[in-house]
Amino acid sequence: MAASPEQFRGQARLPRCASPLSYDLRLRPDLAACAFSGSAAVAVAVSAPTRFLVLNAAELAVDGSSVRFQDLVPSEVVQFEEDEIVVIGFGQDLPIGEGVLKMDFTGTLNDQMRGFYRSKYEYKGESRNMAVTQFEAADARRCFPCWDEPAFKAKFKLTLEVPSELVALSNMPVIKETVHGPLKTVYYEESPLMSTYLVAIVVGLFDYIEGSTLEGTKVRVYTQVGKSNQGKFALDVAVKSLDLFKDYFATPYPLPKLDMVAIPDFAAGAMENYGLVTYRETALLYDELLSSASNKQQVAITVAHELAHQWFGNLVTMEWWTHLWLNEGFASWVSYLAVEALFPEWNNWTQFLDETTSGLRLDALAESHPIEVDINHASEIDAIFDSISYDKGASVIRMLQSYLGAERFQKALASYIKKYAYSNAKTEDLWAVLEEESGEPVKDLMTTWTKQQGYPVIYAKLDGHDLHLEQAQFLSDGSSGPGLWIVPITSCCGSYDAQKKFLLKGKTDKVHIDLTASQNAGGEKGENCWIKLNVDQTGFYRVKYDDELAAGLEKAIKANKLSLMDKIGIVEDSYSLSVARKQTLTSLLRLLNAYRNESDYTVLSHVTSVCLGIDKISVDATPELSRDIKQLLINLLLSAAKTLGWDPKEGESHLDVMLRSLLLIALVKLGHDETINEGVRRFHIFIKDRKTNILPPDTRKASYLAVMRTVTTSSRAGYDALLKIYRETAEAQEKSRILGSLSSCLDKDIVLEALNFMLTDEVRNQDAFYVLGGISLEGREVAWAWLKENWDHVLKTWPSSSLISDFVKSTVSRFTTEEKAAEVSEFFAGKTKPSFERALKQSLERVRISARWIESIRSEPNLAQTVNELLQHDM
């Protein structure tokens, strides 16, 4: 059979017989017509006999008559839309060596926040379009034909033709501009070797502010006109982060400039394009008067994360998407390192346990996936930008750093960056460098964590002076998987002075423990008689203690003998073990009682999350007890909340500001009348006078949620007042606060109204997930009925994986019965797509886990008695 273009269909990757060396691209975006045209001249190296050039193109019209390779005219130019490729065939084999491929093409500036797209903004009261790119993972092919895989690194030289009054930015600095009346041509310097997914273009009206690093690299923050002041905080973090990373990686920042731009419509949080980082507004802008402390923290972490990518991801790039975690896990881990250095008072490494927790919760599902995951089609890539690649990735890096030691680890990373700069690497390449530098068996240890999904629970049992350990794969459904890990075990006994460290290589092991240090003079067991495994939660695993060890830790928590990280680890492990039916809800409630005098934000953020989880399940599991359980949880949080009150105090810490917000929101969600009434009272004052300081940004969300708890169809003034604020504010953070409150109403008709409001032009598509995230238990049936009715529209409007997955997760995961799981499965039968298939399976698994947990709670003999006892104790 003669070779034909058909042979290239259905392949995971492009053929390797030709590869690009450099691209010379000219693009003309037409912002009024929402279209663009372009031409490409690509220097190509042909390395093996072939008569075809195969590259990626999607939603582009390639002009076949314009295509040339050197002076050869192709015999055929065929586009396969489903495979997102264009195949250019010639009458004979192409000469081995270098040649230039030329072609013209046209496309649409879409409204789907991927490829080359348009974003709406207001200028002087009128709506305008800006042109923006978002190419990760596989969408550069929607802007120009290219070899759209990370390993095909090339140099890029761009030329843009744009309206002369607009700012036009790309990865590299401008060489020159020539103006021809209403249009100008902008020429950019050629980039170093880079992957296609990092190419970027932004064209629109902007203000900017500027700073520079110690090396003299110019850093700018671009914002909508009039908002540049809100870029100051991010600029400061960016300049300091670049200096810090230069030292940490022992390699200078690779480009001549760095621009950061706030984009009004943006699907992700931010994107690390080389030298031109794009952000949604809430992730870059910070306003002293209008932003909350948690917004400030989010900006710092996001900026540090994206700038870490300039080394880890951009300079050294993963060879294929299987190794995505090398990009994301490292950028997440290193962003905490930077923010800890810049803001030590934020206690950032303790807050890092938020990441570890979300990684552990997702990875306890049978429908999780390994850190290194096989990718066979571009449509599968988006779905792995999840808590496994980011949070588990970052957590196993922290575990490895803790095992090897910070200095050795840093030295090895610097060697890795030097070795693979301007090139690509696989996970094994990193292990090889770390192994060489440290002399430790890194590859054997880490392969168990990256190539198999899941993680272990370590069962710990004390027998005299011997501590017996046994590992088994932990799954939230209560079963044990087949996994076996090499586990870095750390332990301390009675104090943090003498810690033991060793590797658990098999299923079981035992350790000799010296208990004398932890006993009172008389030999009896006091508050120092405790043994804690996984010290400071550096390991990515859970621990199930026997009753004696658990009692010792409970005493130690009450006596405040444990570190913040260990207090977090114990309550998180206990909650997850309860969900998996490995311990009772009764014992979890007793443990929570030990935290009643806790006042630290980092610990209480985990305690409140556990409280809200218990509250949700108890409504379905024990309706007759749920009021009492609510009261118990309220009592647990109340003293810390009363100490802080509603009003900020002079000179209080950043973490106390965050704690106030956290506790008030939790008390409102738990239905605490006093907090709800106070939130409503303050809201009424606030809507009469927006300049009042009775509701600063940090307590606004609690107040808005309180208002929505009192709204009904017949008494809806609060809902309408919130909508009015939404329509009048220009601040993205304030808009997101309101959207997250509207759907939390207990009245089903109002929930429906909020969901329908989300479909209007008044809500940007990127912001839908705020509304979805706010849905109350009372609104779950309405939300599910709404999703079924609007599914086709939703699928068309939100094609991006992360956003469509939010719709599925938010509506499905709140259910708790096998019948509901069956109903959901039936609805989606024949409707699933790779972009949300994993999210659907995980959501259904969560429903079934809840159903089993409920069954188990109903059969607990002492639950009512314990709840009663603990309530009596509170009186």
Curated annotation (Swiss-Prot):
Protein family per UniProt: Belongs to the peptidase M1 family.
Chain sites annotated for binding substrate: E136, G269, A270, M271, E272, N273
Main subcellular localisation: membrane
GO biological process, one term: peptide catabolic process
Molecular function (Gene Ontology), one example: metalloaminopeptidase activity
Lineage top rank: taxon: Eukaryota
Record-linked PANTHER family: AMINOPEPTIDASE M1-B (PTHR11533:SF298), PROTEASE M1 ZINC METALLOPROTEASE (PTHR11533)
Gene Ontology CC terms: cytoplasm; endoplasmic reticulum; extracellular space; membrane
Binding residues for Zn(2+): H305, H309, E328
Cofactor binding, note field: Binds 1 zinc ion per subunit.
Motif segment (Dileucine internalization motif): 722-723
Name of the protein described by the UniProt record: Aminopeptidase M1-B
